[in-house]
Structures are given as C-alpha cells and as structure tokens.
Amino acid sequence: LIQNQERPYFDKSVPASVPNEAGIKVYSIEKPTEPREIGYLKLRGKGVHRMWFTDGKYAHVGAMLPGIEERAYLIADLSNPTNPKEAGRWWIPGTKEGEETPPDWTPFAGEHFHVHGAIPHGDRSYVALVDAGMVILDISDISKPKTISHIDWSPPFGGYAHTTLPLPGRKLVVAVDESVKYDCNEGEK
C-alpha cells in the first residue's frame, strides 16, 4: 500500500506546528487491520498529488521536485518497498529553473502548466498536464522518459486535464478535464 504526502492547497490556514511531510509512504498490509509503515520516499516542497501503482514495481506520480515549477512526472522504484528511490522524471519544457520555454509550450495568461497525473501502459505513459493538455511519453528507458507526442486543447476548450486513460485495445486515450471554477464557469469541456 502506498500513500501520497502532500501539503494542502489551503496551507495558509494550516498551523505552522503541522509538519510538512512530502513524498510517498509505503505500508505493509500483511495484517490488513494493522498497516505498518515500512518505507518512505521523502521529497522536498509540497509533495505528491496523484499516483498510479499497479505493477508492484513503479509508482507514476505528479510531484513537486526541486528546481521545477509546479508538479512534474516522477517515476518511483518501489521494488524494494523498504527503500523506495527515484527512477526517472520528466517535466514540461520550460518549467525547469534556467530553461527557456519553447514557443509551443508557452501558457496563456492564467493557465496552469503542470503534471496532474499519469497512467502508464507498456512502454508508454499518458500524462495529464492541466492547461497544457496531455503528453504521451516513451518510458522504455524508465530513467529518461521522452516525449512522443503532445496535444493541447485549451484554448479553445476549457482545459484543466485531470486524467488520461489509455484504452490500448481500441487504440484510444480518453482525456477528462476537471472543473475548477465556480459553477463550472470555464468554458466548454
């Protein structure tokens, strides 16, 4: 069992006495009614948002990483659950400190460019990028994810890509946008 550790978005209302734990906690559920922490991948910053962990080896997560604005894509090796490690990372071009933003990755005013979550299948990972649409990554070398393709539908549509679910048997990816504004007032999705 894994659990994300993320500082709440409303952290201005969180007392300073509450510790900022950021990362991935790993638990043994040998005794399901008595989960026991056995490992911890500690990260700096606000921590880990969404996670996908189905193969028993790698967790695919949206995480705050040093030197990268907002969330990036982190692949955590959990094959030794008592000693989890970073296996690979990818970030939206232009979001790493000192990196120039390529023209095709430039956000419009008010847009949020960061990783929301990732769902891998085989040697591909399908990554939701909030207002930057989605990207398909080649993860055949887990330590160096590489962009295969990118599509951004915001604008003209409302954006805030939440989930990108591959349907390999149908050669499709279903992308779902999240409503984050009052009364769903952010344009057609």
Can you say where each PLM-predicted feature lies in the sequence?
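Feature marking well-ordered beta-strand scaffolds used for ligand recognition
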Residues: L1-K189
